Amino acid sequence: MTDPDMMKTFQKNLADQQKFARGWVTKNINKELYEGAHADILTPFLEDDQTQKKLIPSALRDIATWHMRHAMDTNVNEKLFPDERLSLGGLYTFWYQECAHAIMESDDPAGYRLSYRDFIPVCTMLALGWPNHAVRMAETLFDRWDVQKGGNGAVPWETFGEYMPWVAIKLYKAWRGSDEVYEYEPEIDQLEGFAPMLEKLLDPSARMFGDALAKAADFHVKGCGFDDYDVVKTEDYWFFPVELLAACRIRQLRGLDVIDVSHPLFDATPLGRLHDPLPVPRDETLSKVLPLFAKAIGGNLDLRV
């Protein structure tokens, strides 16, 4: 990426992300949301395993956001790899999805629905080095893809202009060797700058994949923004390119080489690089909440991953 104008945009995005991340973690209201998730939802539920059980997923989502935003702050402002925060954020993201799915499968779905963007965290699981979690999350999401009435699976992808969820799906399918084609699924070449990476994902040549990965990184950088036409619309992913890291992890899992690619995106922050798999943390709150939640909703939650 040598375009001077692009470098200016890149630096501006980095500065914006630094301000956003630091501002978020210092706002008292966000701390109150995190603490409220524990005090107002999880603690009462742990006392009787019934109170506000339908809100357990939303509480887990708030806690996941808390940890992930702290990880972003550490990443862009302290330039440190936020392993503890990142692993906790990933773990709570995973169980939010599983618990929400369990409620969606119940007689009272309580307003929970599959979001089109929920496929992106499958890449996050791979970036963390948690393939079992990635498989489980993807299977959970595909369950809802066809079942959910009026869900995003029944809407042409162009309607949303979202690239990354479909990149996540195509990466997953290539990794798992699935040839299933979903309704309204875009062709690889419709995903523009991500197409070469998808096409060379399992190429035996590490150099061929590396060249394609650099093109995808260019496309990622160009697409960071909040407008409808932007490719990477979620700020948390601007400097944590989970779709690119997932592609590298898939090659590792397939026993294929990944060469070191020089690119400003990969060098800007610690989360721009693929790291060794993180250990799955043991979290005391989850260890108490999840078994009770599974029991409270009738056992429709498999706690084994």
Where are these regions (language model features)?
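C-terminal structured domains
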Residues: 230-305
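Eukaryote-skewed repeat-based solenoidal scaffolds used as protein-protein interaction platforms
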Residues: 8-221
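Acidic, Ser/Thr-rich low-complexity linear motifs
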Residues: 152-156, 225-237
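Non-catalytic carbohydrate-binding regions of carbohydrate-active enzymes
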Residues: 204-232, 270-280
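Solvent-exposed interaction surfaces and binding hotspots enriched for charged
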Residues: 3-4
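Residue-level signal for functionally critical sites in structured catalytic/ligand-binding pockets
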Residues: 191, 220, 224, 236, ...
